[in-house]
Structures are given as structure tokens and as C-alpha cells.
Amino acid sequence: MTNQQGRLRTRVAVFACVAAAALIVDQLTKAWAMAALSNGQTIRVIPGLLSFTLVRNPGASLGMGSGATWVISLLAVVACVALAVAGVRTISMKWSVALSFAFAGALGNLIDRVMYADGFLNGKVVDFLNYGWSVGNVADIYLVVAGVVLVILILMGEPFSHKDLIEQSDESLQSEPEADAK
């Protein structure tokens, strides 16, 4: 096995393990919420900031798109495939970990849409983390955090692929003679 193949296997293993662990946490917290909050009760955790309230959300973030649940579900399928492919193709462990959390979040909510469906891809996501202005779940937290981390990686110039790495090397080589001339 070459060094490059070994690094690829490591990234794939990390992606799979992080995504699986995150997905398990998401699904266990939703199972707890459905069992503990099924009678419509609210549990106050931090008064004014966080409570647990069970909500079945047919839409996307903040309940948007509740009339187009199947479209949201199809987009989630596409997102899961794209995130898995990107997570395996990247050369960066940082990108791989961030993408694994995004994948776990997208897949966690997609699982809800399939398991709690009124028809083909017409299900509802289990939300229970009530912030007062929004109700979400652990998968939503993964998606938000992954999004922030991905933006940071882009802004930091973290190479995603070999092409990015080569372009960065070429740019640094081109800027060195300019620096030497000054």
C-alpha cells in the first residue's frame, strides 16, 4: 500500500467513524425526546434560553418549506451523496471531519423524514431543542457548526484537493521571486 492510499484509508475511516458516532448521538437524542416529551410537556433546561419541547417539523430550517416536504427530502438525499463523496475525495482531514458532521446532520434529518413519513419522502423531522425563537435538534447543530467550520476552512485557504494544493504551491513559488526582488 502506498503512503497516499494509507492516508486515503485513514480519511475514509475518520469520516465514517465521526459520521456514525454523530448520527448515533442524533438518533438517540431524538428517541429520548419522543419517549420523554410525547405527552406535549415542556422541560425547562435554562429558563428563557433552552427548553425541551417535541415538535414534528415537515419543513426545513425554521419550518420553511413545510408544503414541499418531498422536495426537501430529495434535496437531502442529493446533499448526503454529495457530502459523502466530498468527504472521501478531500485530501484534508479538517475538511473530512467537517464534512462528516454535515453528512451526519443531513442524514439524521433524512432518516426522520423516511421513518416518520405520511407518504413517499413526506415525513417530518423530530425537533426538540427549543431556543424560544426556533426548535431544532442535534442534527441541526451539526449542520450549523459544519457550515461555520467549512467557511473558516475556505477563508483560511485549507486545500480541499490535490489541485488546490498544487495551485497554492504555484502561487507561493511565484510570490517568492517578487519578495526576493524587494
Curated annotation (Swiss-Prot):
GO biological process, one term: proteolysis
UniProt keywords, alphabetically: Aspartyl protease, Cell membrane, Hydrolase, Membrane, Protease, Transmembrane, Transmembrane helix
UniProt entry tagged with the keyword DNA-binding: no
Location within or outside the cell: Cell membrane
Catalytic residues (positions): 127, 140
Pfam families attached to this UniProt entry: Peptidase_A8
Topology relative to the membrane: Multi-pass membrane protein
GO molecular-function term, one example from the UniProt record: aspartic-type endopeptidase activity
Transmembrane segment boundaries: 12-32, 68-88, 91-111, 135-155
InterPro entries in the record: Peptidase_A8
Keyword check for Lipid biosynthesis: no
Catalytic activity: Release of signal peptides from bacterial membrane prolipoproteins. Hydrolyzes -Xaa-Yaa-Zaa-|-(S,diacylglyceryl)Cys-, in which Xaa is hydrophobic (preferably Leu), and Yaa (Ala or Ser) and Zaa (Gly or Ala) have small, neutral side chains
GO cellular component, one term: plasma membrane
Documented EC number(s): 3.4.23.36
Pathway(s) annotated for this protein in UniProt: Protein modification; lipoprotein biosynthesis (signal peptide cleavage)
Function: This protein specifically catalyzes the removal of signal peptides from prolipoproteins.
PANTHER family listed in its UniProt record: LIPOPROTEIN SIGNAL PEPTIDASE
Family, per entry: Belongs to the peptidase A8 family.
Official protein name in the record: Lipoprotein signal peptidase
Organism listed in the record: Bifidobacterium longum subsp. infantis (strain ATCC 15697 / DSM 20088 / JCM 1222 / NCTC 11817 / S12)
Species classification: Bacteria, Bacillati, Actinomycetota, Actinomycetes, Bifidobacteriales
Chain's gene name: lspA
